[in-house]
A protein has these predicted regions:
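C-terminal His-loop and adjacent cap/lid subdomain of alpha/beta-hydrolase
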Residues: 35-722
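Secretory targeting and sorting signals
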Residues: 2-31
Length: 722
């Protein structure tokens, strides 16, 4: 076949949190278990909250990074607790045996906050020693310091790597590290509701709006810091109230952070010219600091692991600039949602709660419809067998018949060698089979080379693309929408892609080594690691009625994976139309803030998962916004019944039509002999022979685990050794 194609919190000392390890005597401390979380966010409750339990002995813990072995930039914000009436002046602090005298401030709960700077690359042993009536007590915090430019845990960095600092107004940078000095600029919010540049933050113009943060009215002036971390350009925005004071608190900050993530999916090799966006009235008007980086945009970097590293490093810098945070909320749609889900699972506590919108579970799971839609579109254009528009739509599964075309036009080139190369990557360095076989390959898989490895025969990243045994149109056949003859012709002519991403007549075959590595790395989001202990409000802006790739079944795909892992009480799905986007976003942000606040205030017994479920705010649960803008509570399920499903019907996609279960976690199915009793259709003897020739090794058996499927190795995997 032919192939074409209002700050509302008080002193920083209110920040509470249990310790992973409490240290008394000569012992070793670990980082926060609850980290930056605090008692309450509203003013009344914050004032009434207890001052905090005094430690029985000396303790030290990292605040700016919950994983002290992954600290970067030569400094770390720490909290020290001392026994009795001792003060920080009574303590002897050393790093690797040498006396240091960093500045500390006393917090409201009696602990001491300070920044340990000047750390050497590698291991630093920060020790606090005090004399008490019972003798000398010590606590030690081992910190492993990494370069600000990275990497930390993501493994060897891509080269070449093209810089784009000038797109952000920063100085030009040199490859491959793309470092540039940080700069601060200012904007203000006008009374007309827009942001405008401002040269002097101490002198806002007459049309400047005001914002109330922590019961204090301030000019709505925004401080924006830009610089480079982990080879990414980062941005941090917060209400300006003078120079940030990490040890004294900032009257313009509510001590909470929103971290934004951007969409897309592409192969990297460049810095990126945008972030997830930080100048956002929804967040800033409530007193949040907002942060992001260019490597937190999946279209610049389709690796959730690199994104996790960049987010961790940028967040560390935020906390060392502004001080401890109560919690961090993730935000972003599409590829931004992928990063939230995947980081929450594989690198938990970088974000404490997530607000994914128009979500997908992970990049690999979206490969199915990307490839399938390219193949199906090509097949239906080339075949001599007639398929009606209704039959084609049923085979593809989407509500809108053009959704498959949208998938193909948006992302099919991301599996090819050079079809999606960013303009920042010079043509001269790009791969060419004849003239530049060692050149840059731009496929999205390039971003996970450290996890999957390379095929030594081709130099390409080992592929997880596979459609062997996939019975395209199976559900359509079983429902009588297509005939056995059409089913046979479809599966005979569908073809696949080769290692360069080009359409070929043969079906795609995954690299078996890549399959096992993908599952081990949690690149197929299991939903069973950190995500099981992360509050989730999945914002499903319903777009199925048009040719849009962001179809609603994906929220339920992720839910099904979480159900398979034994819990879904931490996920809320909220469906709405475009007319309710602002209302839904505002509600979800405030609800998540309250949810995290409630959890932090819960000192009762139970697992983290128990606390998530029992501290969900009253009124928060599955539901939707009706056409009149009213939000209703209604338990949601895939293809369930009720007012919400009637208003927002959920359909399918090509792999679900082909019989794959809702969890959609099979990269390559195991095979079983054809069983004609499962089709609900009559095949002639000749047709049976034809179908067996189409599937000589059998068809997908979804009652068995996927080939290579295994539990992930765990959270916080370090790929530093390559």
């Amino acid at each position: 076949m032919a192939r074409g194609i209002t700050r509302q919190v008080v002193a920083l000392g209110m920040v509470l949190g249990s310790l992973a390890t409490v240290t008394v005597g000569d012992t070793v401390a670990a980082s926060d278990n609850a980290g930056e979380r605090a008692a309450r966010v509203d003013v009344r409750a914050a004032r009434e909250a207890p001052a905090g339990r005094k430690a029985d002995g000396v303790t030290i813990r990292a605040v700016s990074n919950r994983k002290p072995r992954f600290v970067s930039g030569g400094q770390v914000l720490v909290r020290i607790a001392l026994p009795g009436r001792l003060t920080i002046s009574d303590a002897r602090i050393t790093n690797n045996g040498e006396r240091i005298r960093p500045h500390f401030e006393r917090s409201a709960n009696g602990t001491w906050i300070g920044i340990i700077g000047g750390m050497a690359l590698g291991t630093n042993r920060i020790q606090v020693e005090v004399r008490t009536p019972s003798g000398v007590e010590r606590a030690t915090l081992p910190v492993v310091n990494h370069r600000r430019r990275g990497p930390v845990f993501s493994g060897p960095q891509q080269r070449p790597f093209f810089c784009e600092t000038e797109a952000f107004g920063l100085d030009p940078a040199e490859r491959p590290y793309c470092e540039a000095p940080s700069e601060v600029s200012y904007q203000y919010r006008t009374t007309g509701g827009r942001f405008a540049p401002l040269s002097d933050p101490t002198s806002p113009p007459a049309d400047a709006a005001t914002v109330t943060v922590r019961e204090r009215e301030l000019p709505y002036v925004v401080r924006i810091e830009r610089g480079t971390i982990d080879r990414a350009v980062y941005e941090i925005a917060g209400i300006y109230s003078g120079r940030p004071q990490p040890l004294a608190g900032d009257p313009g900050w509510n001590s909470k952070l929103v971290y934004t993530f951007g969409g897309g999916c592409n192969g990297g090799y460049h810095q990126g010219a945008g972030t997830g966006g930080v100048v956002n009235d929804l967040f800033l008007s409530r007193g949040y600091v907002v942060a992001s980086s260019s490597l937190n945009v999946l279209n610049n970097n389709c690796s959730p692991i690199i994104s996790a590293e960049a987010a961790m490093m940028v967040k560390e810098h935020v906390l060392e600039t502004y001080g401890p945070a109560y919690h961090t909320i993730g935000w972003g749609g599409s590829g931004g949602a992928i990063q939230q889900y995947d980081i929450a699972d594989a690198y938990p506590q970088i974000v404490d709660g997530i607000l994914p919108s128009i979500s997908f579970p992970d990049p690999f799971s979206t490969l199915g419809p990307v490839v399938d839609c390219g193949l199906l579109n090509d097949f239906f254009e080339a075949t001599d067998v007639a398929y009606s528009a209704a039959q084609q739509r049923t085979v593809k599964g989407f509500r809108d018949p053009n959704t498959c075309r949208a998938w193909e036009l948006s992302f099919f080139n991301r599996i090819t060698a050079t079809g999606s190369c960013d303009p920042a990557i010079p043509v001269a360095v790009r791969w060419d089979a004849e003239t530049n076989p060692d050149g840059v390959r731009c496929s999205a898989a390039e971003q996970v080379a450290n996890q999957l490895g390379r095929d030594p025969r081709t130099g390409f990243v080992r592929s997880v693309l596979d459609n062997v045994g996939v019975q395209y149109g199976l559900r359509a056949l079983q429902r009588g929408t297509i005939t056995p003859a059409q089913f046979i012709e479809l599966n005979r002519g569908i073809g696949g892609v080769d290692y360069t991403g080009e359409l070929v007549d043969e079906r795609a075959v995954a690299d078996r080594a890549a399959l096992g590595r993908a599952y081990a790395a949690d690149l197929v989001n299991s939903g069973g690691l950190g995500l099981a202990q992360t509050p989730v409000i999945d914002l499903r802006n319903y777009r199925d009625a048009g040719p849009d790739i962001h179809t609603a079944e994906w929220s339920y795909v992720m839910r099904q994976r979480m159900i398979r892992q034994g819990t879904v009480g931490n996920q809320v799905i909220l469906e709405f139309g475009s007319n309710s986007n602002e209302a839904a976003s505002t509600y979800a942000l405030d609800a998540m803030d309250q949810w995290l606040t409630n959890i932090a205030a819960d000192d009762g017994p139970g697992t983290p998962g128990d606390k998530i479920v029992r501290n969900r705010p009253r009124g928060l649960g599955d539901g939707c916004y009706l056409a009149n803008g009213r939000r209703i509570r209604e338990e949601l399920s895939y293809r369930g019944s009720g007012q919400c499903p009637e208003l927002y019907p959920i359909l399918s996609n090509p792999r679900l039509v082909a019989g794959e279960p809702l969890a959609r976690n099979a990269l390559k199915c195991q095979l079983a002999p054809i069983d004609f009793s499962t089709y609900g259709a009559t095949f002639s003897r000749a047709q049976r022979a034809e179908l067996r020739s189409v599937f000589p090794d059998g068809v997908c058996d979804h009652s068995e685990p996927s080939v290579g499927e295994r539990p992930p190795e765990g959270a916080w995997i370090d790929y530093s050794d390559g």
